[in-house]
Amino acid sequence: MEKNIAVIWGDCSSPEIVKQTLRVLDKVAEKYGHTFHYTAAAMGGEAIDKYGDPLPQHELDKCLAADSVLLGAVGGPKWEGLPGEQRPEKGLLRLRAGMGLYANNRPAKIWPQLAPASPLKPEIVAQGIDFIIVRELIGGVYFGQHQTHTLENGEKQAVDTMPYAEHEIERIGRIGFETARKRRKKLCCVDKANVLDTSRLWRAVMHRLQAEYPDVEYSEMFVDNCAMQIVKNPAQFDVIVTENMFGDILSDEASMITGSIGMIPSSSLGDGTRGLYEPIHGSAPDIAGKDIVNPTACILSAAMMLRYSFGMAAEADAIENAVSRVLDKGLRTADNMSEGCTCLGCTAMGDAILAELS
């Protein structure tokens, strides 16, 4: 099979993890008889430095022409003083909107080998942590109207709106139900329906969808309670579906209970098969150039790309199993190092995963 992949190398330490990920993809292509073509696309700080824009149209066009997009991470201290529209993160928002990616799927799973690294009590971890947060990605408060104005008394007031239309809720809700149907058949819709009209509309739409999925156990939970339950009893969750801002916050919380943010991939999908795949961690500017950043989340993101966009389940399994065997051997990067294990740098971890793939 032949596929075209747009590669956003990213900022700070990001190119280091992307380099190792492409090595893994090349090994998969060699082993399974595929051909992957890579096209570099600039976004974030790199694009700001080159073009004065976090995502110029010609760079977005490269992503739209590809079968899928692999991203490292963008941003860093160098660009923090820029106005909002010129910041690296704005490029990511525009990329998601331009590609029509409305569903972010982020797994929260503890690898058994890394269970001691979880900040949760061992008895909670022992119950199992394996759920997915399906987050609506291009609606809500991040894409609503934003304004700051001056009141009559001279003080400033800022207003951000959280708009959602029924079709936006229905399409993400359907992905939530379909995802649950393929897993343990439990879906929890997280909202703030006791306060927000948008949340009440979410519930109304989800109730209509529920009738189409009688095999899925459906429940609802307020976002504040969900934030507590994720650390108190994470084993109760299978799939969580929620709006943009709630999902942003909850998925970051969920990432921390797994023991290492450097192990968590993510996918962003729309109506077709083309998606955006990226690790959930940032660009780690403090360790850039030191060859110590953990490439595993980016490599696992590539595995998600093979599975969800290219239909290459066996190839994705091969990568994930290779990572598991590396962990079985006690090989770690600095972020998830524990007593009795061997600490590897970024390139060495890439080498170890490649060796397990061979």
Question: Which positions does each model-derived feature cover?
Answer:
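Glycine-rich phosphate/diphosphate-binding loop of Rossmann-like nucleotide-binding domains
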Residues: 6-23, 27-29, 153-224, 236
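Glycine-rich phosphate/pyrophosphate-binding loop and the adjoining helix
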Residues: 138-139, 143-183, 187-188, 193-195, ...
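N-terminal beta-loop-helix "entrance" segment that forms/cooperates
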Residues: 33-57, 228-230
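Extreme N-terminal starter segment of soluble prokaryotic enzymes
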Residues: 1-5
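Generic secondary-structure signature for well-ordered alpha-helical cores
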Residues: 26, 30-34, 65-68, 97-104, ...
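Buried hydrophobic positions in well-ordered alpha/beta secondary-structure cores of metabolic enzymes
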Residues: 11-14, 67, 134, 176, ...
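Glycine-rich phosphate/nucleotide-binding loop
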Residues: 45-48, 231-331
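N-terminal glycine-rich phosphate/adenylate-binding segment common to multiple enzyme folds
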Residues: 49-159, 245
